[in-house]
Amino acid sequence: LPARDLWLQLIHTRAETGEPYIVNLDRCNEALPQEQKDLGLEVTQSNLCSEITLPTDSERTAVCCLSSVNLEYFDEWKNSEQFIDDMITMLDNVLENFIEHSVDTKGLGRYNATYDRFKNYVKKDHKGFTKAAYSAYRERAIGLGAMGFCSYLQRNAINFESMYATSFNHRAFSHIKERAVAASNSLAEERGEAPDMAGSGLRN
């Protein structure tokens, strides 16, 4: 089967069903934080829905802690000083809970262990989670997404293809990203940077 024909079949099926999910790994690796590139890490796959593109290798199984905000109520929470901060802190707390239940963090000590050292401190009943726990420990990957975009547009009588919809999209996601990065900076000062992100000022 010629590659062009296969590609056309994939695109046609995607247009009809929404699947299969298609991921450009070269683009994912271009967007990987420089700190992780410097460690020789690489994205080789995504999860099924393709919203998680994290490095995996013989020592790591990708772990990402996800939540979402409801954009339908954006006007109600956009001016809150704490809303996004609280979401980021909650996600970091969930990761910390996973790490602490998987690893003897007191015995492990300093917060920058190699895999060979780390695996010796994984709790006996969590040995099957060693690579996942190490990934969580090193990267502290979180994702704060959004739902309710169309609901916001409907509630405010905004046409989906209008410039107003495009403007809202940019405004909402810029707000979320700006507040999320600021929250991660604050957490890095309070709790320390993720080992993979040393020097970035980021916790997640």
What do the PLM-derived regions correspond to, one by one?
Residues E139-A146:
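Aromatic-lined, polymer-binding surfaces characteristic
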